[in-house]
Regions:
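Membrane-embedded alpha-helical bundles of multi-pass transporters/translocases
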Residues: 2-464
């Protein structure tokens, strides 16, 4: 073992990087199903009132705001034999797969309205809580593998490529899978539009180290955000003044550009290890699970606000998901089948992550971390506050248009009022939120040079 590795600056193999990244691919097969299609399922297949669905999504996420810190605190204060963090991929992976399969039972479509509401509430709440048990320790694994900034960047890039593979598989594969199950023609324009925004990840993420050296950390973020804003502007102009179907190529190009802007959300995970290192520098402890739990709360806050606002406000504007023509097949068995396939494949990928990840840097506090100390950490760390704020806004921008994207390519099928509602959520609101993200990134204080200084000081303390 080299001196650098003794001090935590481990160099990782591609087997370790891909093994770790497979965990994000696995989780995205489930998370993207919920983010993009659960609302459509509840309103168009089960015919539950969109206002209730809106409240349900918000309520579950509020529960998670309390649940995630509990999970993070529990994990930080324990050290299981199979690994401080990786063991939960196994312990939580099995119930997560079962809960995902039970989320869209075909029998539920025949139940009474009250029973549907109880079923939707229980199944979604249980899935969300189990997901946190897997997601929080998974996010902590990265900070335990190495302190090396270059390795963290490569690991983040690998993780995000895998995550985006999961995203593109679900966003394009779900409508394709539904069409195949009910033996109808596949709407390739719709499937492409749903997923093509993920394509930039496969080009930009592998080139991230080079782009970061060329543009700088903040310069890279600003460039991506600017491209995204142009893409949203093009989509708005085409949707408002032209026939979308006549400009399909330009529409798909613009969607790719919006994906470039929203890719900033994926890159935010690279800042989490920085915040953890800064916390270790100040306190002497490395609260990886606690910080990841708070990041998870912020991430889910953006997701939940999007899920709450979208059906509610679109209904006020004039678009009711339950009564408008559905953009997807509504056969309950088709939804159940596709969801189960993604969940089962996800389980095997979680096991690959469990076997491929190696924890090199972990600390367990001498005394348990209290919730008061977690709050003090939040108040003491400006870096953490800014990163959490960015998480909320950028993922709100990402998810607020998720379910509505399925309707954009079919704008001509809807009334003028409904078209305006679709455009507001697929173009205007995400663009405004990206501008806010740019402002928050401007305030982020940790430069790469400062991080190197912090790591050297931590190393010097460990030798003393």
């Amino acid at each position: 073992m080299t001196t650098n590795e003794t001090n935590g600056f481990y160099k990782l193999s591609w087997a370790q990087r891909i093994g770790f990244g497979s965990g994000d691919l696995a989780q995205n097969l489930i998370f993207q199903t919920v983010a993009c299609y659960l609302m459509i399922y509840l309103t168009t297949v089960l015919k539950i009132n969109p206002a209730f669905v809106s409240g349900l999504i918000l309520a579950v996420r509020l529960i998670d705001c309390f649940w995630s810190p509990i999970v993070g605190r529990y994990i930080d204060n324990r050290n299981p034999k199979l690994g401080k963090y990786r063991s939960y991929l196994l312990y939580g992976g099995i119930p997560l797969t079962i809960a995902a399969c039970l989320l869209m039972l075909p029998q539920a479509a025949t139940w009474s309205t009250n029973l549907k509401i109880v079923y939707a509430t229980v199944s979604y709440t249980v899935l969300s809580m189990i997901y946190s048990v897997v997601n929080i320790p998974y996010g902590s694994i990265m900070a335990s593998m190495t302190r090396d900034n270059d390795e963290v960047l490569i690991l983040t890039s690998t993780r995000m490529v895998c995550a985006n593979i999961g995203q593109i598989v679900v966003q394009a594969g779900f409508p394709i899978g539904l069409a195949m199950c009910v033996h109808t023609a596949i709407d390739w324009n719709q499937a492409t539009f749903m997923a093509i925004g993920t394509i930039p990840a496969f080009v930009i993420l592998p080139a991230l180290p080079m782009l970061k050296k060329w543009l700088g950390k903040k310069g890279l973020y600003y460039t991506l955000l600017s491209i995204g804003l142009v893409g949203f502007a093009i989509l708005f102009v085409i949707g408002k003044f032209f026939d979308v179907s006549s400009y399909n190529t330009l529409v798909q190009i613009a969607k790719v550009m919006t994906g470039v802007g929203l890719l900033v959300g994926s890159l935010m995970w690279a800042l989490v290890p920085e915040v953890i290192t800064e916390a270790e520098y100040r306190t002497g402890n490395r609260p990886a699970a606690t910080v990841n739990a708070l990041a998870g709360v912020a991430f889910k806050a953006g997701f939940s606000i999007a899920g709450w606002i979208t059906p509610l406000v679109m209904g006020w504007i004039g678009f009711n998901f339950a009564t408008e023509e559905s953009a997807l097949a509504t056969d309950p068995m088709a939804w159940f089948t596709v969801t189960c396939i993604f969940a089962i494949v996800g389980f095997f990928l979680l096991m690959l992550c469990f076997m491929g990840s190696k924890e090199n840097i972990t600390t367990t506090p001498e005394k348990p971390v209290s919730f008061g100390e977690m709050w003090q950490e939040f108040k003491a760390s400006k870096c953490l506050q800014l990163v959490l704020g960015i998480f909320v806004v950028v993922f709100l921008a990402s998810f607020i248009s998720g379910p509505v994207n399925a309707y954009y390519t079919k704008l001509a099928n809807y009334s003028a009022i409904a078209q305006n509602a679709i455009l507001v959520f697929t173009t205007i609101i995400p663009a405004i939120l990206l501008i806010v993200v740019g402002g928050l990134i401007y305030k982020y204080p940790l430069t790469d040079e400062r991080l190197d200084e912090i790591n050297k000081e931590i190393e010097a303390r460990s030798k003393a």
